[in-house]
Every structure is written in structure tokens, then in C-alpha cells.
Amino acid sequence: LHAMRIAGELKHYIPLALKVVDQTERRVVQGESVPAVEKIVSIFEEHTDIIRKDRRDTYYGHKICLTGGASNLILDCQILEGNPADSELTGTMFDRQKDIYGRYPLKASLDGGFASKVNLKSAKGKGIKDVCFAKGRGLEIQEMCRSSYVYKVLRRFRAGIESGISWLKRSLGLDRCSWKGFESFKSYVWSAIVSANLLTMARVQLSKQ
């Protein structure tokens, strides 16, 4: 049985190792630019994606899109494959709110990476009255929000969401997944999300006593 287990592991890992050798030869010897979708960055967790952030930092794992509300609860979580640009995800995130809760939000605050004139126009067309992008990328405050006051409120709200993400990483282990496989990766993320929401609801209940 032990020999069969080892044989099974070799059958799984040898093709991955050969793919790593191939992509290394293409990149180093032939000078070819290997597309990220073709790269194997871990033979033990072959589902791992290469994630570039702000064209500076490189991470390995999967991009996670979180949506939070005024209740401090996490309202939605998307665990993505590949490294799609944030600007390509804006409409989907809004549509998911409509699918889950039956309506679009009246106000929204997003990272600068989600900003574009097309995304702003699309959001306004869905009835979202105020859309605050952390970095306007050519958009004026008057285009995004009905007033500078609302814009500042939404910016502060987004800062609170960022603080919540830091808490997820620091206290609930969301900075690094220790479970094996992509399905387990998703379970790990959702366990942190559910735990965070349960803690938030418990704090609210305790504050009422």
C-alpha cells in the first residue's frame, strides 16, 4: 500500500515537474515570455495563481473580492482563478449584490483599481447614486458623488473596510492558507469570513446587555 501511494504521488508530480522544466527552458534559454496562466509556481499547490498588485508587489494564491456593509458584516466573497484586473470585476460585484439581496446598494466605495468611466456609468445606470473610488483615475468628485461630504463619508467607510481586512489577516489567519487544494482553499477563506461575521454579531449582542 505504501508503494502504491508513492507511485500515485509520482504519477501526479512528475508531469508537473516536467512542466516546470519546460517553462524554465522557454523563459531562461529561449527568452520567451511565458503567460501567467501557463506557469506552474508550486508543484504541491498547482492551482496557485500569480497575483500582481499595483504593478509592484507579487503574491501567490488567489484573488479574493470582499463586499462589506454598514453593519460591519461581510456581505459577499468571491474567490477567483487567474488574475483579472479589478476594473473587470466592478459590474459583477454590483450584480451579485442584486442577485443575493434583491437590489443594488444606494452607495458604494471601492479601491482605485475598480475605477473607470465605464464602470462609473454602469453603476449609475444600476441606480447606485454615489460611487466613491479611492483613486479617481481622471474622475471628478462631482461625477462620482452628489456632494463632497458624501464622498468623504464613503472614503472613511472604505478605510473601515480596509481595517476589517487587516483584522481578518491578523486574527483569523486570512493572510496565509494552510489547507491543501483549491477546494480547501475556498473552505479556508469562507471559514474566516463566517467566523468574522459570527464575532461581529456576538459583539453587537454583548453591547446590548
Regions found by a protein language model. Name each.
Residues S42, G68-L75, G102-R103, G138-S147, ...:
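Short acidic (Asp/Glu) and glycine-rich catalytic loops that position anionic groups and cofactors
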